[in-house]
Structures are given as structure tokens and as C-alpha cells.
């Protein structure tokens, strides 16, 4: 099977945040959207056809999450990541961000310290502060063009009474695929100080060769018993609008507390199309993901080459995973406000300002390259032309 990732899909007017929410969320509708983390590719036909078949039935009552939802995910995780998961460990949740918030509510108390590792996916911050927990930072370190964990500081924070670590694995926005050794070192610190590991693995399928994703909970049973993992087909298969994710918890006590909180909030029902899409994605998605990663890999190479030849004041932090690229723009000598205005209004390219990802994000921008190559090249040309106005 072959997928046409070069095909241009007109998303304007489709009520999508990425294209139709530019004015509301970024402040300009007159820019090329290369920001929010969904792709401009068609969802695979075997998914859309299954949704259409269900829609043709014409009745959309309360859905039953059947065996296929669970077994397809279990088989996918074993096939793609060599992680053996049991059905009882899996809980549905309407999105990874809700799952992170529920895990915080279920396992910590107001005033508890929770570690995050910025620059990182910004909803992690509000998942802590919205619930009156205390946010503590273990800032990542940019070393040889890669964001790395500071294990000495992590040890200090864990020893100081932190109750939970929220991990982005693989990392968003930096694209680091944490190695087995890095994860073992991180987990050893957390186990030593009884810190729960909340591992957001939504980007786990989007890893470039030769790197390999390691689920934290696959490292050992002891580590698994201290870990809550979130996964979803949304980034991989462009299904974010269907609000479907899964939470995997081996520890029965942690799972009981999570499910109790989920039940109290009455948000565990899900939607009929999300169930179908998730099952089809995990049953039939191997060739799609393989071809997608080959295409995205070519986009990365195109980006690196163009920036090296034309944009000397920008450095690409080469991603090991995700369709999101962390751009080091500090040599441009601009404040964060000036940087955002330059790209949004002068270059007319809408990206996420690095500062929104917390400490360490200052002077950076996050670019979404999950688009046809011609769209990526258009954005790069616009940025090059904009430098003439500096």
C-alpha cells in the first residue's frame, strides 16, 4: 500500500484549529500554519471507511467499547514496541491531557510537588498548577544539539519530597528519544524516592531510524508498578478530533485511584467513532506509519539543508522523533516577543513560540513539519525572504 503525502488538502473552512484558529490563537489569519501538533495529511482510508460505514448506520447511541479496542492496542504495542500489556491494565480516557490531569488529581494532594522537565509540552504546567500542586522544574540541558536530562538535579528534587514526575517520552518539543539507559537512570531515582512516573508517550510511534522508543513501563515490573503511561492514535494517524486515548497502569492500586477519579468526573464514555478509529489504526497501521516516517525523515533532511544554506542565524535541533522541530533562533538577537512577531507578521509563518514551553524555551520556535514537502518549502522561502527586512 502506498500513501500520497504530497497531496495538498485544503483544510481552510473545515473548522480546524490549525488553519481556522490562527487569528484567535496566534493573532494573525494571514500566515502559513506550522504550529499546533496535527498533520496536514489524510487519515488512512481504512480508518475513514470504517467511520463512514458506522455513520451510514444512522444511529449514534451510547457506544460499547468492545474487545477489539483493547486487543488491537495490545497487539500494536507488542508488535511495534515489544511491550506486553494485559487488557486489565488499559483504561480509556478522552485524550492524553485529560489523562494527565486525572493522574495528578488521583495520586497527589494540593501542595504536593510535581516535577516537570522544561522546555516541555505546556499543558503539563497547568495540569499541576490548576489543581493547586507545586510545580518544580528539572530543566533539560541542550548538549551537543540534543536536549538531555539533568540527573543530578532530578535526584535533588526527588529527595526533596516530590510526589510525581511528568515525562514526555519521546520529548515534545525537543524531539529527544530517551534511551534505555537514560530511562533506567531516571526510573532508579524515582523508585528510590517513591516518585510516581507519569509518562506521556503519545509520540511513541513517530520515531526516526535508527532510534527506538522504549516504554518506561517495559523496563521492569518494579518500574511498571510505579508508572502511569498515556498513549493515543491521535498524533500518529491524525485523529486528534476524536478525543480517544488509553491509559496503561499495571499497579492495581494506582489503576483503581485513576479509574475512581475518572468515574467521579463522568468523562469515561468516549465516542463511537473514536473507538472504531483507534481499533482500525492499530490493526492496520504498520505500513502507513513506516511510509509516514520515511516521508517525515525526508522533510527533516530538507529542513536541515535549507537552513544550513540559507538561514545562518537559525539552528535546527535535529529531532529523533515527532513531526515537531525545535529551532534555535537565539543568534537572531531578538526578544521572544520580537521573535514571534518576526515569524508571524514578517515571514507570515505561524509557529509556536519557544517561551510557551517554559524555562529553556526562550529564543526558540517550534515548527510543525507534518505537511507536504511543498508546504514546508513554502514556509522556508517565506522565512528567508523575511530576513531582508531585518
Residue ranges and their predicted role:
Residues 2-95, 102, 281-284, 390:
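N-terminal small-domain helix-loop-helix segment of the aminotransferase-like
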Residues 60-188, 205-206, 213-218, 222, ...:
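Conserved core of the PLP fold type I
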Residues 155-156, 223, 335, 342-351, ...:
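PLP-dependent enzyme catalytic core of the Aspartate aminotransferase-like
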Residues 219-257:
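Active-site PLP attachment segment
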Residues 222, 253-273:
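Active-site C-terminal subdomain of aminotransferase-like
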Residues 256-262, 281-304:
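Structural signature of PLP-dependent enzymes
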Residues 279, 295-304, 316-329:
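Conserved glycine-rich beta-strand-loop-beta hairpin in the small C-terminal domain of fold type I
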Amino acid at each position: 500500500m502506498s500513501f500520497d503525502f504530497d497531496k495538498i488538502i485544503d483544510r481552510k473552512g473545515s473548522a480546524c484549529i490549525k488553519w481556522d484558529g490562527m487569528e484567535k490563537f496566534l493573532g494573525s489569519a494571514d500566515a502559513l500554519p506550522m504550529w499546533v501538533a496535527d498533520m496536514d495529511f489524510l487519515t488512512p482510508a481504512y480508518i475513514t471507511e470504517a467511520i463512514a460505514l458506522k455513520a451510514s448506520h444512522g444511529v449514534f447511541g451510547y457506544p460499547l467499547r468492545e474487545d477489539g479496542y483493547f486487543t488491537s492496542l495490545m497487539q500494536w504495542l507488542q508488535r511495534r514496541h515489544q511491550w506486553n500489556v494485559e487488557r486489565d491494565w488499559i483504561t480509556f480516557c478522552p485524550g492524553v491531557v485529560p489523562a494527565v490531569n486525572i493522574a495528578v488529581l488521583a495520586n497527589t494532594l494540593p501542595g504536593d510537588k510535581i516535577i516537570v522537565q522544561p522546555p516541555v509540552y505546556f499543558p503539563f504546567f497547568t495540569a499541576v498548577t490548576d489543581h493547586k500542586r507545586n510545580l518544580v522544574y528539572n530543566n533539560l540541558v541542550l548538549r551537543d544539539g540534543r536536549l538531555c536530562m539533568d540527573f543530578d538535579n532530578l535526584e535533588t528534587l526527588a529527595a526533596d519530597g516530590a510526589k510525581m514526575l511528568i515525562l514526555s517520552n519521546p520529548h515534545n518539543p525537543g524531539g529527544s528519544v530517551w534511551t534505555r539507559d537514560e530511562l533506567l537512570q531516571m526510573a532508579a531515582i524515582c523508585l528510590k524516592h517513591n516518585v510516581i512516573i507519569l509518562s506521556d508517550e503519545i509520540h511513541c510511534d513517530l520515531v526516526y531510524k535508527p532510534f527506538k522508543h522504549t516504554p518506561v513501563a517495559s523496563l521492569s515490573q518494579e518500574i511498571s508498578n510505579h508508572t502511569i503511561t498515556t498513549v493515543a492514535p491521535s498524533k500518529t494517524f491524525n485523529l486528534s478530533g476524536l478525543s480517544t486515548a488509553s491509559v496503561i497502569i499495571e499497579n492495581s492500586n494506582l489503576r483503581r485511584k485513576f479509574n475512581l477519579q475518572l468515574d467521579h468526573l463522568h468523562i469515561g464514555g468516549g465516542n463511537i467513532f473514536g473507538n472504531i478509529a483507534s481499533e482500525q489504526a492499530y490493526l492496520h497501521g504498520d505500513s502507513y506509519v513506516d511510509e509516514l516516517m520515511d516521508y517525515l525523515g525526508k522533510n527533516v533532511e530538507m529542513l536541515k539543508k535549507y537552513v544550513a544554506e540559507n538561514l545562518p542565524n537559525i539552528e535546527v535541533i535535529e529531532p529523533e522523533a515527532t513531526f515537531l522541530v525545535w529551532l534555535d533562533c537565539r543568534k537572531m538577537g531578538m526578544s521572544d516577543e520580537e521573535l514571534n512577531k518576526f515569524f508571524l507578521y514578517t515571514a507570515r509563518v505561524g509557529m509556536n513560540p519557544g517561551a510557551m514551553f517554559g524555562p529553556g524555551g526562550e529564543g526558540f520556535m517550534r515548527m510543525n513539519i507534518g505537511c507536504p514537502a511543498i508546504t514546508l518549502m513554502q514556509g522556508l522561502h517565506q522565512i528567508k525572504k523575511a530576513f531582508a527586512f531585518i
